[in-house]
Amino acid sequence: MKLQLCAVGRLRSGPERDLVEDYLARFERTGRPLGLPAVQLLELEDRKGGGMEAEADLIAKAVAPGAALVVLDERGRTLSSPEFADHLAHWRDSGRDVALAIGGADGLAPRLRDRADLAISLGRMVWPHMLVRVMLAEQLYRAATILAGSPYHRV
């Protein structure tokens, strides 16, 4: 299994990057004994200014062939953290590669959303795409702790 996080744009150094790196490192430490791979973070830049369509092309090219495509989108399913952990365990157990895709400031092109195996939402509010990375990295770590039976996730 390969786990990719494909995100449009680059995080500059600062608190958002620090948080993403911290949560992905925690995920790797917690997930490795569970058979979860380290997350491959792919920061994609549309240098030609082609908007959502060009960004969709970049994401599509970055996704491993045959990988399950999971897009973050405000119209997606709202999952609880345990439900997200169940999805992660299912992907791990099936051995299928997974690509989590975060669009740019304007979101994802409809053709990419339509192609996705799963669209998930972090709630009904719209979030800046740079913060979505932090929130998704934390949810990956949280999912690993749920699968490990750690007390990090409290309800």
UniProtKB/Swiss-Prot annotation:
Keywords: Cytoplasm, Methyltransferase, rRNA processing, S-adenosyl-L-methionine, Transferase. GO terms for cellular component: cytoplasm. One of its GO terms (molecular function) is rRNA (pseudouridine-N3-)-methyltransferase activity. It is an enzyme of class 2 (transferase). It is found in: Cytoplasm. It catalyses: pseudouridine(1915) in 23S rRNA + S-adenosyl-L-methionine = N(3)-methylpseudouridine(1915) in 23S rRNA + S-adenosyl-L-homocysteine + H(+). Specifically methylates the pseudouridine at position 1915 (m3Psi1915) in 23S rRNA. Homodimer. This is Ribosomal RNA large subunit methyltransferase H. The gene is rlmH.
